[in-house]
Design a protein with these regions (language model features):
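Conserved N-terminal beta-strand and adjoining loop/helix that marks the start
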Residues: 1-18, 40
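Conserved hydrophobic "DFG−1" position in protein kinase catalytic cores
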Residues: 11-12, 19, 88-90, 105
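Conserved Nudix-box catalytic region and its N-terminal flanking loop in Nudix hydrolases
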Residues: 16-57
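Short secondary-structure junctions
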Residues: 58-65
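Active-site-adjacent beta-strand/loop module that shapes the phosphate/pyrophosphate-binding cleft
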Residues: 62, 72-94, 104
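Conserved S-adenosyl-L-methionine
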Residues: 67-71
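NUDIX/MutT-family hydrolases
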Residues: 87, 96-127
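Generic C-terminal helix-cap and adjacent flexible tail
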Residues: 128-132
Length: 132
């Protein structure tokens, strides 16, 4: 089975967290699900560099990476995903969607109301147990 390693940004602005909705996908089980933004590392990149690049490419935002949060290993039907999540901050919540179909800035206690991609659920649950 194919393995994919990615990074994800938990972007916080004024005590709200950015949640993005994926578009249509060849894999039904992640199509139109919410997720934390991020992507795959390029050769020679650190995880922090990858997050900054991906967020700039996908959202036209600049972020500060504060600290590593949790790593999730999730087996989907077609691949195994290892996702390293990081707490990030931004100074400006304005973004431009280039790959996603919706964005929401939510308080921690509102996160569970979204239909999350399965690999992102452990991150969402851990966030709900934290104080921001």
């Amino acid at each position: 089975m194919k393995s994919i390693e990615v990074v994800a940004a938990i972007i916080i602005y004024e005590n709200k967290i950015l949640c993005l909705q994926r578009g249509e996908n060849k894999y039904d089980y992640i199509s139109k699900k919410y997720e934390f933004p991020g992507g795959k590392m390029e050769l020679g990149e650190t995880k922090e560099q990858t997050i900054k690049r991906e967020i700039h490419e996908e959202l036209n935002m600049h972020i500060d990476v504060e600290k590593e949060f949790i790593t999730v290993i999730h087996q989907y039907p077609d691949f195994i995903l290892t996702m390293h999540s990081f707490i990030c901050k931004c100074d400006n919540p304005i973004l431009k969607l280039t790959e996603h179909i919706d964005s929401k800035w939510l308080k921690v206690n509102e996160l569970e109301n979204l239909d999350w991609a399965e690999a992102d659920i452990p991150i969402m649950q851990r966030l709900m147990s934290c104080q921001f």
